[in-house]
Amino acid sequence: MPVDTAAPQSTANPDPSVQTDRAAVNFTPSTDASSFQFYPDNPESPLARYRFAAKGPSQYFDPCQESANMSMKCLERNNYDRDLCREYFDAYRECKKQWLSARRKDNSQWT
């Protein structure tokens, strides 16, 4: 019987709008500094809205899960030295801020 040696595929965030290939990410799509995005997640994507609406009342949903995973990987790589991973934490906070402001702006799309 052959043994499968392929690396397991991550199923934590199946959102196709999340770009996980670092070479393909364009963090500065324009010269306007307000449009810069320093995290791979898209917390306002239609899939994020659907998954939030479909979850149970006691379930937790994090549209910035990819940023959270990147923060944890950085901590593991750097022996849990928070100072070396500050940019990852800031990116996660920015993603959460974008998500919460989108929910506050139009809560009807998130229920």
UniProtKB/Swiss-Prot annotation:
Motif window: Cx9C motif 1: 64-74
Leader peptide range in chain numbering: none
Keywords associated with the record: Disulfide bond, Mitochondrion, Transit peptide
Annotated function: Required for the assembly of cytochrome c oxidase.
CHCH domain residues: 61-103
Name by which UniProt lists this protein: Cytochrome c oxidase-assembly factor COX23, mitochondrial
This protein's record includes keyword Disulfide bond: yes
Originating gene: COX23
Source taxon at top rank: Eukaryota
Chain spans, region Disordered: 1-21
Biased composition (Polar residues): 7-20
UniProt cross-references to PANTHER family, sorted A to Z: COILED-COIL-HELIX-COILED-COIL-HELIX DOMAIN-CONTAINING PROTEIN 7
UniProt-listed GO biological process terms: mitochondrial cytochrome c oxidase assembly; mitochondrial respiratory chain complex assembly
